[in-house]
Amino acid sequence: MSEAAMKKVTESKAAIIEKIQMSGRLVVQSPLCIGSGQDDGITDSLVLKNKQGKAFIPGTSLAGVLRDIVCSHDSNLADLLFGNLSDNRQSMINIDDVLLENSVYTVRDGVRIDGITNTAEDTGKFDYEVVERGAAGSFSATITIRKNDIEDKKAVEQLAAALADQLMYGISLGAHTAKGFGEVKGSKIKVATYDFSQPDSLGAWLLGEMSQADIYAAAAKPLVADDDFYAEIDLALKTSLLVGAEPDAFDKGSGKDEWKVQKVMLSSNGDYVIPGTSVKGVIRKQAEHICRVVGDYGDDFLGSLMGYSKADKAKQRSRLRTYEVYLGEGVEAVNQSHVRIDRFTGGHMGSGLYTNKPVWQKKADAKTMTMRLAISGCSDAEAGLMLLILKDIWTGQLAFGGDKAGGSGVMQGLKAVISYKGHKYAMEKAAGGIKVSAEDRAAMNSLVEAFVKAGVRA
């Protein structure tokens, strides 16, 4: 290329002045459900796979999630990096598909519950395929900064670092994210910046080397909005716990039917788990109960928070997000036999003996699990409602899993940290109750009062 032609290229507004390369690994932390829109006649929804039958995360899905995160903080920055159709602004960023390795596929069941009768709806049973946690793949994204964007170069560089930090902290994508699915975290995410005005840096980009690039090693830091609510509560298991799953051949055993195990505790990648769907269901039911007892909140209050899907196709995405709850090594599974009782005679029913295999805590009052929930765009009234529900979980007023009538699924709170509007509230178990500072107690009481006032109608 002649000197004149080179000068013309470098003076063009479309000339590339910098490349930012983001790279690392993404690891699936909870079941991932990115549906293909197809079924196989047995499972209602199958995971998206390539022609070789391997699951992958589309780059478009990652771009959509990251754009939504940025947009919640600064819509102008989101338009700058990801483009805007109305302004004919093209996207600066290109994100590759993430091909998942070591993928294990399982099928999760679901059932639609009638909110009034608390029973399953007719034809409400469904299932879907998921990629179990532990699958991982290589992540790569490239940001191209051109001469006409030179004034925004610094902002884009800072945003790239912030997105890398967010990936290290974790994002949620795919279906059922409000119920704990699709949690993905980055591993060893690096941001390499190549300044094309420097020959060595340009050469390093062309050769795929990082030696001449400005490297940023990302750390786990989320982009959190001021009105986001986040709670993390450490729990011990007071009773048995059984979120039912079909037993394998070993648990089924042989011999008489009544001695065979009918249900075992659900597990995911070797760890016992309370699904986010179960946590969401328990919280929603308790929220409905509290709202009915405390005041007149109408359908809009919980509909805006929990989401809805109506017969007229009107939909609202849930702003409440629950997560899968994984149990540690402090529990063990034990066979537990039951006898069905005839409620008229008080005697046992014929063929009424059955056996399940729930889990029990080995050591009393030791941390067994951590339950998390988050609300985006949370109001004071919604935060107050969540505090009441967290109190019910802490004190064992709410139970999870099956056999609740028999006392199963009861928790005991040990420690909790709640973040809202830039403040952190801390609670710990203490003799005779909950240890919390006077300042935090007053602030949390004001949030509960805001919830009560929201239910007062003129």
State what each model feature region is:
Residues M1-A458:
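Small/polar/charged residue-enriched interaction surfaces, especially the RNA/DNA-contacting tracks
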